[in-house]
Every structure is written in C-alpha cells, then in structure tokens.
C-alpha cells in the first residue's frame, strides 16, 4: 500500500512538471490542486532562491549596497504591482474562457493583455531612469547610498518591460492550466541570474566586474531569457493559447474588460507595496542604515517563504476561474477551501522556522552584529502572523480568480493604510516600542485582513461576477 502511494505520488509530480494542459473542471479536486500547485510552488521557490542569492552576493559589498537593493526593490514593487494586476486579470479572463471551452477568445485576450502591458512598461521605464536619484532620496537613502546605487536603480527601472511580461505571460499560461510552462520560464530566468550574478558583480580572470550594477544587469539578462522562452511557446501554437498576428488588432471590448479587472488588482498590490515603502522609510528614519539593512535581509527571507505559498493561492485562482466558467460553483468553492487548509498548514511550519531559527538565517547574510540583531527581531515578529497570512492570501487570490478584484482592493486599503501604517507610526514614535513597533504592525494587519477576507468570501458575492 505504501509503495503504491509512493509510486502514485511521483507519477503525479511527473505529470505536474510535464507541462500538459488540464481540464480542472472535472476529476479529483486534491489532484487538481496538486497538479497546479506543484509547478507554481517550484516556480516561485526558485524565484525566492534567486532573491536570496542576489542578497547574498550583494551583501558582500557592504551596508550601502544592501540598503540600495532594499530601497530599489521597495520601489520596484510598484512595477510588480502592475505586472501582478495585469497577470491577475489575464488569469481570470483566460481561465473563464477555457472553462467555457472558448479557446479562440482566450488567445485573443492574451494578445490584448500583451499590448496593454507594453504601453505601461514604457512609461514606468522612462520615469524610473530619469528620476532615480530623486526616488532613492524619497526612500530616505543617504548621499553616499544614492551615489553608490543610482546606476543600479536606473538599470532595474529600465528593464520594467521584462518584469511585467515575465509575470503577465505566466499568468496567461496559468489561466490556461499550464502551470509547468510558467514554472520553466521562471527557472530559466532564475538559473541564468544565479550563474551571472557572481561573474558580473566580482568579475573573472583579472576582470573586476561591474559591482552593484552587475547584479542589476544579471537580473535583466536572466529575466529577458525567461520572457524569450515564454514568447516562443506562445507563438508556437501547440497549446490552448495560440496567438496570431490578427489577435493584436485592438478589441476594445476585451481591453475594457481587462482594464476593469486589472486596475483594482493592480491597486491591490500598489496599496500593499506602497505600505511596504512607507514602512521601509519608517524603519530607515527610526534606526538608520543598520536598521534598513537588517530589515531588508529579514524581508528577503519573508519573501523566500511567502512566494511558495502564493503557488497554492494561484492554484486556487485558476481552479475557481475555470470551474465558474463551467458553471460548477460548488466545486469552485470546495477547491478554494481545500487550498486554504493546505496553505495554513504550510505557513504554520514557516512560522516555527522564523521563530526558532532566525539567528542562523540572518547570520548567513551578514557578519554585522547590529544588522543581525535587527534582522532576527524583524523575522521573529513578522513571522508570528504567518498562519493568518496563509489563509488571507488564498481568500484574496480566489476572489481575484473569480473576477471580483474590487473587494480585495478595499480589504487591502483598510488593512494596510488604515491599520498597518498608522499603527506602525504610533508604535515607533509614541509607544516606546521603537523599531519593534514597525514590525508588530505587520502581523496585526495581516491577521485582520485574513479574518475579513474569509468572512466576505463565505458570503458568496464572487459567485455572481461576470467576466
């Protein structure tokens, strides 16, 4: 019996990684979650490794370099917000069309999403490249940090298009049920970046490398390769999504529908990432460069464990979209509740790791005693609310996948801007908590978001949304 289950388990893993497109409107729900979640978890896990490897190599360049990466990543989350918002809209629309068996409209929707993304990417790139100094100054960077890091910031903003397309096209493939192809594109991007990082930063055989700018260039090259792989498979036409040149003719009905879903989804993450920018600034103002460095190391580790959990959340989004398209509402809800259970279990294990192993985790990235102290403190406090975070992220993504992107936006606004930021400011400035106050505001807000999102999801408004 045990041997049979082991064989079945590895057979499912092989099937999940093969890259076949599945009809998730029928069959065992646990199997459907597994087939979708495994490649999504592996996809985002390697993205997490990529973020940590980046911080490991950059960390050897000193406090200023760590701070620059932290400041820039905080600002780049605005681009991530746009990318994830467009990706969320694409996943919801394409999953619904696939559930309805309308693959031609699914392909046209994918092409329209690519056009919309191109316009926004150009605008973000121009703004970031021109105003890199001012953006770093706004984040609270010192004169020395700005001088050392402005080129890094320019390069990262200049590559906005590859960031947006990498996320968007993966959302398209996930909506079509091909999570494995999305995984492979991010693997390509991450592996190339990991190989190029030390070469471009430190050099080789007498070449001194590009230092901090080398880290940015390695990231751009890696992501560019991932996008090239995605585009190849989109135009190859062997799967559900078969994009033709005629699909790029503007279809204003689809564009309107896409934007109606994308702008709330984008603002969800703008609201969330904007609050993180304010929190980053608050930490810098309260504790200086050492506090910023410790906090950024902690956040990179938080991201390392949160991104795999997003794999389960994204699986819920695809399942709810396809099953609503097939008019199987009960199956859609059961899929979400099962994914929520699995995510809560996973995040409870992560919480234990952060509480008991934070010291060796942070020490791996730096030898600075003060940076380690602050990083450990941040990891332990922020990690204490991870069970609720796991529940909340599935609820929010499920509503997004159903096409109800406005409700999670309102929840995010209340949780982050009416609770987290005011609470963090009060605790750091007036309560005597100091830096700890900024850290405690995070799990408190995330717990509130999870409770509210769960309650609203169970009310069932998402069942009536048309996309």
Regions found by a protein language model. Give the residues of each.
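Transmembrane helical elements of multi-pass membrane transporters/channels
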Residues: 35-54, 155, 189, 222-226, ...
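Hydrophobic/aromatic residues within transmembrane alpha-helices of membrane transport systems
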Residues: 42, 54-58, 69, 94-99, ...
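Helix-terminus/linker motif at the lipid-water interface of multi-pass membrane proteins
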Residues: 45, 49-67, 136-143, 201-210, ...
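Small-residue hotspots at the loop-to-helix junctions and early N-terminal turns
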Residues: 63-74, 149, 153, 216, ...
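Small-residue-rich hydrophobic transmembrane alpha-helices
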Residues: 66-126, 163-182, 294-358, 389-411
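Hydrophobic transmembrane alpha-helices of multi-pass small-molecule transporters
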Residues: 78-81, 193-198, 227-231, 304-307, ...
């Amino acid at each position: 019996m045990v041997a049979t289950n082991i064989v079945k388990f590895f057979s499912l893993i092989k099937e999940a990684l093969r890259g076949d497109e599945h009809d998730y409107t029928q069959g065992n729900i646990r199997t459907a979650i597994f087939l979708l979640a495994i490649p999504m978890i592996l996809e985002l896990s390697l993205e997490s490794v990529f973020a940590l490897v980046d911080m490991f190599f950059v960390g050897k360049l000193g406090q200023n370099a760590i701070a620059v990466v932290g400041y820039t990543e905080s600002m780049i989350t605005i681009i991530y917000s746009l990318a994830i918002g467009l990706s969320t809209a694409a996943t919801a629309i394409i999953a619904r069309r696939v559930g309805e068996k309308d693959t031609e409209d699914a392909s046209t929707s994918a092409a329209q999403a690519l056009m919309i993304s191109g316009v926004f990417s150009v605008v973000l790139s121009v703004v970031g490249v021109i105003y890199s100094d001012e953006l770093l100054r706004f984040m609270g960077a010192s004169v020395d940090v700005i001088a050392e890091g402005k080129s890094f910031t320019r390069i990262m903003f200049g590559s906005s298009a590859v960031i947006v397309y990498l996320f968007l096209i993966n959302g398209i493939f996930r909506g079509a049920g091909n999570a494995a192809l999305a995984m492979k594109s991010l693997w390509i991007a991450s592996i190339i970046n990991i190989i190029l990082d030390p070469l471009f930063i430190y050099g080789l055989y007498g070449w001194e490398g590009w230092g901090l700018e080398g880290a940015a260039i390695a990231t751009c090259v890696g992501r560019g390769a991932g996008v090239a792989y995605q585009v190849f498979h989109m135009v190859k036409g062997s799967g559900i999504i078969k994009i033709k040149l005629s699909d790029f003719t503007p279809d204003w009905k689809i564009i309107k529908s896409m934007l109606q879903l994308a702008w709330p989804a984008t603002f969800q993450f703008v609201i969330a990432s904007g609050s993180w920018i304010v929190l980053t600034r608050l930490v810098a103002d309260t504790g200086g460069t050492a506090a910023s460095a410790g906090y950024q190391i902690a956040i990179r580790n938080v991201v390392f464990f949160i991104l795999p959990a997003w794999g389960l959340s994204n699986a819920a989004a695809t399942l709810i979209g396809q099953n609503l398209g097939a008019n199987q509402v009960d199956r859609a809800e059961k899929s979400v509740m099962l994914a929520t259970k699995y995510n809560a279990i996973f995040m409870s294990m992560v919480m234990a790791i952060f509480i008991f192993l934070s010291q060796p985790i942070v020490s791996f990235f730096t030898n600075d005693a003060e940076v380690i102290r602050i990083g450990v403190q941040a990891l332990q406090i922020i990690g204490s609310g991870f069970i609720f975070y796991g529940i909340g992220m599935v609820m929010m993504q499920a509503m997004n996948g159903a096409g109800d992107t406005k409700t999670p936006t309102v929840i995010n606004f209340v949780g982050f801007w009416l609770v987290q930021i005011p609470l963090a400011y009060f605790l750091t400035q007036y309560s005597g908590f100091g830096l700890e106050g900024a850290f405690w505001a995070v799990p408190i807000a995330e717990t509130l978001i999870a409770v509210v999102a769960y309650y609203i999801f169970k009310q069932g408004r998402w069942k009536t949304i048309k996309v």
